[in-house]
Amino acid sequence: CQRYDDGHYAAWRHLADEAPDLVVFLRDYSYESAPRKDRVRTHSGTGAAKTLDDYRARYAQYKSDADLQRIHASAPWILTWDDHEVKNDYAGDRGQDLAPDFLARRTAAYRAWWEHMPMPPSTRPVGPDLRVHDRYDWGTLARFHVLDDRQHRDAHACPPAGRGGSTTVNVADCPDLLRADRTILGSAQERWLEEGLAQRDVRWNLIAQQTLMAPFTWTKEGRYWTDGWAGYPAARDRLFDAIVARKVANPVVLSGDVHCNYVCDIKRR
């Protein structure tokens, strides 16, 4: 994540100094939020980004930063998106505020993202949809399976009353959380991922995606956060079952989202 009004991009400056071979960016290239006077820097516009012109202006502002320009010039990028490129905590065609015109907003946001990111022309948006998931090989050393767990996911389980989006829940209070048919990737992307992981021609399989895949609880009593994979446990189980069944070589999950660093072994449950 690189929220412009949180601070300056010193990290990009230092990374560019190290001359990386590749940059892998996993979510929230830009933020849709309205400008605030109490921030380090101020977002463009007079309100949250909602229209195509709004989103284009937001990317123009982010890309005016000299350090961000430099890191783009330093190395090729592999990247995916998450929610803030559109609207916080959206799920598929459903916005957090349940606004009836959300799909039009998503369409505008997707178009602006595609226009400003190093994506091939073949991925041009089709209506409100844009294919982001893809595979990239680094010789025979590693394969990046880049996922999109935002566009095709089911709605969050047990959202707060009167709105969409995530929360923390106890499993006992939210039977919907454990439904076997719930998906965070969509069935087509799940099949695509399993088929790619089954190939045995690289040493490392790097699953690059937006949100925490490791189980994440907020309390000792087991309150689960529903925006990450903990909110879609059946989908995570299917992926882990496939990794075991296919005997996938050296799987490693790379995750974005939480503005912290974790290194851990991911358990099935």
Summary of predicted features, one role per range:
Residues 1-269:
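Metal-dependent phosphoester/phosphodiester hydrolase catalytic core
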